[in-house]
């Protein structure tokens, strides 16, 4: 197919048009007074959201060159969402500001490569400033405040997340589910999560979320590969008779065995799923033993002389529910004996005390958290399904933000931390033409605060000027329309979220500024619609009246 090529100024202008189209749609959601965006769906009710990455992911532009610009900024939002779980709107606003400011300088004849290097150095200086401004989260109150801000100033969500973290520990597993009632509640269930997803996507029970859920399943725990169906068949027949689902945890399930399981799952003969065993080597054996003790099962192990063909239902583990996605498996409410579980916990604690290796200690603590930490389930309630989906997305964002805050600490919110980084960039040792790139970042660091103020109905430049003339965590609280100490007021952002938003924005904007040519498929001008059916289409169907 023929290609169309755009060069230099024309290419950058088209890219900027795409960047602006996406950033304008995302930026309206920024801050506590940000607006909602309604997204049409091919089926079902429209989605109402205030989440930047959800808006960004829906945007596809007709012009291929403009679309390239939009897709590159979409990458900023997606990457920030994947690594920090929040801050997608901030990242988008920053990326647009850096590209827009940089474009003016490139048009004026400055070297794009020098500008990019200046942007990279300024980004480093700004990140150092954020780290210096950062404070660790010490209290449950601070965790609740981070959750509240991320959930669009919803205190209920912030408090529930803080309570969940308090109950299962900061390293514990917290999941978000839809409630049957209008109330948002917290349940803490004993369980275990490990980082292995389903072996085949055909095991999925919810194709929209790509999740496999099994209720009251039997669990077969095998330390080797399963490739032969013959040994597995008696167990499958027994579980099918009982009408119960079966989860297989093994080193791998492949060949004939996997094909048979998938075919039976698709036909509806068996409710089944298979996941790879977590860990490697001796650690895998230990983790499989942990799962066996938690669920009251027996590990199929050659070392112990236990063979698959000799296994009966009594040797299988049991639990209340298993949830599997492409990356993780969560076993909830295992049926193992309490005394056996306590003995295992005691044993792992003794190993932690005895070990001299930091790596081994870390892995043992992970296992301990999985055995005793349990799983906290936040049940999100709302009056309608549309509100439920929107609220659930906010809870997930808030949960990611609080985890990030626990990891790297907190900085003042409301765009103030980025404004405070401007001085650090100005003082950084950046010379020559690269200084122009640093000025681009200094100007862009103002953009999130301007946007928050604009969305709150204030004049961004006036608010920015007032904040610049103060120090530390003093800034503008858009929710209450006051100037105050934002950390005291509970307007805080996780350092990790702000840092990654800035780093991702600088990375992609720098790439776009150094773009000199763009190539896309040429639109086919001869491609028309489908030809009309002869004889006026379906007029001949009138004869079907006689069939009534």
Swiss-Prot record:
It is an enzyme of class 5 (isomerase). CDD domains: GroEL. GO terms for molecular function: ATP binding; ATP-dependent protein folding chaperone; isomerase activity; unfolded protein binding. The keyword Zinc does not apply. It comes from the Bacteria. It is found in: Cytoplasm. PANTHER family: 60 KDA HEAT SHOCK PROTEIN, MITOCHONDRIAL. Together with its co-chaperonin GroES, plays an essential role in assisting protein folding. The GroEL-GroES system forms a nano-cage that allows encapsulation of the non-native substrate proteins and provides a physical environment optimized to promote and accelerate protein folding. Belongs to the chaperonin (HSP60) family. Forms a cylinder of 14 subunits composed of two heptameric rings stacked back-to-back. Interacts with the co-chaperonin GroES. This is Chaperonin GroEL. The gene is groEL.
């Amino acid at each position: 197919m023929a290609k169309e090529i755009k060069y230099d100024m024309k290419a950058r202008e088209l890219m900027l048009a795409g960047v602006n189209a996406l950033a304008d749609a995302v930026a309206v959601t920024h801050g506590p007074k940000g607006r909602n965006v309604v997204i049409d769906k091919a089926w079902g009710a429209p989605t109402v959201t205030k989440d930047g990455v959800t808006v960004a992911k829906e945007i596809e532009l007709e012009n291929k060159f403009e679309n390239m610009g939009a897709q590159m900024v979409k990458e900023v939002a997606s990457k920030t969402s994947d690594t920090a779980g929040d801050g997608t709107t901030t990242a988008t606003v920053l990326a647009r500001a850096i590209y827009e400011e940089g474009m003016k300088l490139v048009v004026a004849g400055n070297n794009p490569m020098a500008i990019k290097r200046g942007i990279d150095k300024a980004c480093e200086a700004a990140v150092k400033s954020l780290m210096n401004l950062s404070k660790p989260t010490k209290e449950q109150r601070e965790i609740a405040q981070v959750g509240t801000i991320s959930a669009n100033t919803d205190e209920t969500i912030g408090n529930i997340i803080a309570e969940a973290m308090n109950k299962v520990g900061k390293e514990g597993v917290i999941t978000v589910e839809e409630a049957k009632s209008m109330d948002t509640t917290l349940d803490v269930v004993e369980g275990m999560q490990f980082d292995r997803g389903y072996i085949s996507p055909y095991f999925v029970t919810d194709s929209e979320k790509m999740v496999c859920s099994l209720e009251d399943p039997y669990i077969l725990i095998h330390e080797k590969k399963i490739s032969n169906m013959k040994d597995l068949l008696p167990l499958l027949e027994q579980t099918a008779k009982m009408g119960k689902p079966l989860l297989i945890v093994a080193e791998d399930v492949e060949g004939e065995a996997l094909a048979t399981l998938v075919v039976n799952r698709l036909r509806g003969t068996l409710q089944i799923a298979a996941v790879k065993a977590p860990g490697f080597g001796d650690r895998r054996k230990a983790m499989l033993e942990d799962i066996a003790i938690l669920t009251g099962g027996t590990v199929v192990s050659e070392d112990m002389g236990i063979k698959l063909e000799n296994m009966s239902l009594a040797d299988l583990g049991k639990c209340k529910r298993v949830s599997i996605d492409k990356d993780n498996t969560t076993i909830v409410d295992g049926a193992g004996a309490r005394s056996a579980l306590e003995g295992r916990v005691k044993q792992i604690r003794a190993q932690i005390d005895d070990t001299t290796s930091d790596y081994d200690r870390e892995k043992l603590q992970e296992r301990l958290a999985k055995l005793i930490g349990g799983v906290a389930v936040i049940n999100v309630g709302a009056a309608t399904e549309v509100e439920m989906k929107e609220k659930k997305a906010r809870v997930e964002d808030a949960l990611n933000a609080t985890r990030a805050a626990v990891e790297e600490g907190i900085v003042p919110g409301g765009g103030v931390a980025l404004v405070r980084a401007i001085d650090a960039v100005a003082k950084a040792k950046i010379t020559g033409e690269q200084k122009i790139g640093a000025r681009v970042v200094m100007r862009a660091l103002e953009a999130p605060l301007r946007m928050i103020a604009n969305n709150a109905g204030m004049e961004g430049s006036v608010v920015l000027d007032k904040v610049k003339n103060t120090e530390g965590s003093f800034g503008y609280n858009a929710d209450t329309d006051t100037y105050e100490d934002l950390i005291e007021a509970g307007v805080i952002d996780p350092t990790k979220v702000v840092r990654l938003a800035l780093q991702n924005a600088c990375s992609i904007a720098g790439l776009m500024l150094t773009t000199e040519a763009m190539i896309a498929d040429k639109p086919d001008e001869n491609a028309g619609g489908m030809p009309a059916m002869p004889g006026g289409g379906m007029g001949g169907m009138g004869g079907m009246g006689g069939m009534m």
